[in-house]
Amino acid sequence: MRKKPIIIGVTGGSGGGKTSVSRAILSNFPDQKITMIEHDSYYKDQSHLTFEERVKTNYDHPLAFDTNLMIEQLNELIEGRPVDIPVYDYTKHTRSDRTIRQDPQDVIIVEGILVLEDQRLRDLMDIKLFVDTDDDIRIIRRIKRDMEERDRSLDSIIEQYTEVVKPMYHQFIEPTKRYADIVIPEGVSNIVAIDLINTKVASILNEAK
């Protein structure tokens, strides 16, 4: 009988350090079959819209995501079957024609701002983490990331943050903190929290042997 993979949900606000926490877990288990799947990969296809319409999309709202597809593909991985994960093109604001083949793993980290918002997704998780970071730090990180990696202007980033990102955080993301098993202040720099999480994952892996 095939053992079920450990599924770890990692959430928090945009620019809050979710990816860094996820990578800290990944790097602690170099000999395990472990991967990270980003909720951002499942933004809905918008190829039927004009570019002008796409840029107005609220990417911090639950309806922006094809969470049904993510749940479907996670269940496939749980059953031991590979999946083709979509790739999102941030410069065109729609789904790319490419996909990435993902084979089943022993540990799957599910990372994204709204991965604890949907109960069906939460029910698949063994460990749920919320990375809790101050608003000021998150906006600075978001500006740096979006200008360097997504070719965004400073004005557009600030406008999106004040009109969409911040209000959506308080409406949809922050309330999911109550579902977390562990809340991590300071993100990846919280060594005690990271060590506790890695110890728990190692314990579950050992029990499954």
UniProtKB/Swiss-Prot annotation:
One of its GO terms (molecular function) is uridine kinase activity. Coiled coil: none annotated. It is an enzyme of class 2 (transferase). SUPFAM superfamilies: P-loop containing nucleoside triphosphate hydrolases. It is found in: Cytoplasm. It catalyses: uridine + ATP = UMP + ADP + H(+); cytidine + ATP = CMP + ADP + H(+). CDD domains: UMPK (cd02023). It comes from the Bacteria. GO terms for cellular component: cytoplasm. Its EC number is 2.7.1.48. Keywords: ATP-binding, Cytoplasm, Kinase, Nucleotide-binding, Transferase. NCBIfam families: PRK05480.1 (NF004018), udk (TIGR00235). Belongs to the uridine kinase family. This is Uridine kinase. It comes from Streptococcus agalactiae serotype III (strain NEM316).
